[in-house]
């Protein structure tokens, strides 16, 4: 992973972000993924995936899902380093590895994971 900062994440996501959205940096791990780096945005209605280029400096693809369309969700916080969130949507399987802590992002990662567990997961 290239050195990523909160400012970079905010700049890349600002035009795609809706009110009350939580943000995190993740590694997509499915065949449906466009690239191997992504910013995830989530609120009570919508989930947005912003796929990033190799250097995490540019959004190259965007996918949106309605929260109600996320099916067969699974969440695993197996170790202290990262959590795995998977689900099916739009006929495809999606899998994201979300680091639980990235020092340069402050509480961004944990805020996203807490929101996900409390408000989105069944």
Residue ranges and their predicted role:
Residues 1-40, 122:
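Anionic N-terminal interaction surfaces
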Residues 36-56:
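Short, compositionally biased strand/turn segments
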Residues 6-8, 26, 33, 51, ...:
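Residue-level detector of functional hotspots within protein domains
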Residues 3-4, 57-122:
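Acidic, Ser/Thr- and proline-rich intrinsically disordered linker/docking segments
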Residues 7-18, 49-64, 120:
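Charged, low-complexity, helix/coiled-coil-prone segments
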Residues 18, 25, 48-49, 90-94:
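A generic structural signal for ordered alpha-helices
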């Amino acid at each position: 992973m290239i050195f990523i900062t909160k400012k970079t994440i905010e700049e890349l996501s600002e035009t795609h972000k809706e009110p009350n959205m939580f943000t995190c940096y993740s590694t997509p791990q499915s065949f449906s993924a466009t690239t191997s780096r992504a910013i995830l945005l989530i609120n009570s209605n919508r989930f947005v995936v912003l796929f990033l280029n190799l250097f995490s400096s540019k959004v190259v693809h965007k996918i949106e899902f309605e929260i109600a369309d996320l099916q067969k969700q699974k969440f695993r916080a197996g170790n202290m380093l990262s959590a795995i969130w998977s689900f099916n949507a739009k006929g495809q399987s999606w899998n994201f590895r979300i680091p639980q802590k990235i020092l340069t992002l402050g509480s961004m990662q944990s805020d996203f994971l807490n929101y996900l567990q409390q408000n989105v997961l069944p």
